[in-house]
Amino acid sequence: MAYHSGYGAHGSKHRARAAPDPPPLFDDTSGGYSSQPGGYPAPGADVAFNVNHLLGDPMANMAMAYGSSIASHGKDMMNKELHRFVSVNKLKYFFAVDTAYVAKKLGLLVFPYTHQNWEVQYSRDVPLPPRQDLNAPDLYIPTMAFITYVLLAGMALGIQKRFSPEVLGLCASTALVWVVMEVLALLLGIYLATVRSDLSTFHLLAYSGYKYVGMILSVLTGLLFGSDGYYVALAWTSSALMYFIVRSLRTAALGPDSMGGPAPRQRLQLYLTLGAAAFQPLIIYWLTFHLVR
């Protein structure tokens, strides 16, 4: 995959007309949030000093700008490839979200312990879209969280004077590869355990992608409060994600159709769910520990 950089190049008079892009799969609701300049209270406070230091570092700003271009380019390419090989109508279900759903789902990912009903809701044997059912998996939050993770990784590398396009590209590709490997392992486990469920590859991709939310919170806390804050946030987000994965996958994989099966098969299904949950903290730590020093 080749990235075309425009740094230092003079604009040409004749530009090749690019082919029109396919329509986006979803509306980006993140545009409503804009950064506000200045206005940090208590200049002597530690948190304010850290925030000023992060935002005022020119290397960090350059890294974030480059990371933004990589994330935008990757998002456009993903949309084009998905339009070529995937049923867009089926995929749109996972992007049928609104602001209220996103806010509630983020809260559920951070603190899932008080949530009671984990059943996915149906209407005439058709699952309700995410904006109508908090338990429905979505791909909007994982996609936006991955882009945010790339931007945050670029800023962290810039602060540590370790930023380079190659390092940031390796960081982004590694995060994607781990999720793909996790989904493939889950598909293999479901096949070997002969689990009868409605889980598709998109469902597994959504559940695997929710870890990016915990990764963002861990890295951001580490940048603001140091390594101690990082490990506290890592422990909290990992525990919350493990609980969320166990309850969500157990409800989906161990549905009513599988409850009447043999006991060994039920144990295999339970082990598969617990194994998927236990693997989450290891991936989060592996993808974030080098960004906090």
From Swiss-Prot:
Membrane topology: Multi-pass membrane protein
One of the protein's GO biological processes: endoplasmic reticulum to Golgi vesicle-mediated transport
UniProt superkingdom: Eukaryota
Modification Phosphoserine occurs at: S12
Keyword Plastid: no
Gene Ontology CC entries for this record: COPII-coated ER to Golgi transport vesicle; endoplasmic reticulum membrane; endoplasmic reticulum-Golgi intermediate compartment; endoplasmic reticulum-Golgi intermediate compartment membrane; Golgi membrane
Stretches of the chain found on the membrane's Lumenal side: 160-174, 226-229
Cytoplasmic domain ranges by topology: 2-138, 196-202, 250-271
Acetylation in keyword set: yes
Task performed by this protein: Possible role in transport between endoplasmic reticulum and Golgi.
Full protein name: Protein YIF1A
Gene it is expressed from: YIF1A
